[in-house]
Regions:
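Cytochrome P450
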Residues: 1-188
């Protein structure tokens, strides 16, 4: 997966390198996570942007009230319907992706009966993974780039010492969490 992630990053970033100005969040930060998650899950490449748009709208909130944005509910329904269609395809024609693995997963319930995950369970999980995973990663990318643009010495240190990247990501997640509308409780 790492090789595919690197190739996807290069595919999205290479066209931007010769340009004097570009919107890194719109042209990379928002697209990259869905490309990776979409490939892992098994979304057709041509449908990933559409799913991302539905997800963005489904998760969007009014910053003043916290209420869902207009069209958010409908977008969430479209996203789930899309996932359900892919799941039905994978049950008929399995492929090498997470959707197929979940479609074929068996487990033993408390009565000892072997069961499969229900469509609702698979659709719910994949929709959550696609929406929440892409949103938080996109926001992390944006937050990190803004922070590092304001801290040139730190940016240079990370550039010079790439082994610090995992630690820097963890610290950026802690310092400027991508999910701002979730309550958190500090504990000892």
């Amino acid at each position: 997966l790492e090789a595919e992630m690197r190739a996807t990053a290069c595919r999205l970033l290479d066209p931007l390198m010769d340009r004097e100005h570009f919107d890194i969040q719109a042209e990379f930060g928002k697209k990259y996570p869905m490309e990776i998650i979409g490939a892992l899950v098994g979304f057709p490449e041509e449908s990933r942007e559409m799913f991302r748009e539905w997800s963005d709208l489904a998760l969007s909130r009014d910053p003043d009230t916290g209420q869902q944005a207009p069209g958010a509910l409908e977008a969430g329904v479209k996203a789930r319907d899309f996932v359900r269609e892919i799941l039905e395809e994978r049950r008929r024609a399995p492929q090498d992706d997470l959707m197929t693995i979940l479609a074929q997963t068996e487990y033993e319930d408390t009565d000892g009966q072997t069961k499969h995950l229900t469509d609702a369970e698979v659709v719910g999980f994949i929709t959550l993974l696609g929406q929440a995973g892409a949103e938080t990663t996109a926001k992390l990318i944006g937050n990190a780039l803004v922070y590092l643009s304001r801290e040139p010495l730190l940016r240079q240190r990370i550039w010079d010492e790439p082994h610090l990247i995992p630690q820097a990501i963890e610290e950026l997640l802690r310092f400027d969490a991508p999910s701002q509308f979730q309550g958190r409780t500090a504990g000892r």
